[in-house]
């Protein structure tokens, strides 16, 4: 469900905010594996995964996820701005 997709994202966000990056990564990867039809929350999760990887000093992985999302996500919402903001910080 849409609310379930948002809940998975928010759970991972809470783990990230608490500094539990490994748990956040696991939660996001589990959500990705579920093949959700809710593209917005999936995209937000990929962005959060890039934040997790930056925190884990895996900046190359973070950048690759962002670039892939930039190429494959085409909705007219706030995702593109989030991607650009993070890519600028990774330069």
Identify what each model region corresponds to.
Residues 1-91:
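Acidic, polar-rich low-complexity tracts and alpha-helical solenoid repeat scaffolds
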């Amino acid at each position: 469900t849409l609310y379930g997709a948002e809940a998975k994202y928010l759970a991972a966000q809470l783990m990230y905010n608490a500094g539990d990056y490994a748990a956040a990564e696991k939660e996001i990867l589990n959500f990705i594996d579920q093949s959700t039809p809710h593209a917005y929350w999936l995209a937000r999760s990929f962005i959060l995964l890039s934040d997790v990887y930056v925190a884990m000093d895996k900046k190359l992985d973070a950048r690759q996820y962002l670039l892939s999302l930039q190429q494959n996500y085409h909705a007219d919402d706030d995702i593109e701005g989030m991607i650009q903001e993070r890519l600028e910080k990774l330069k």
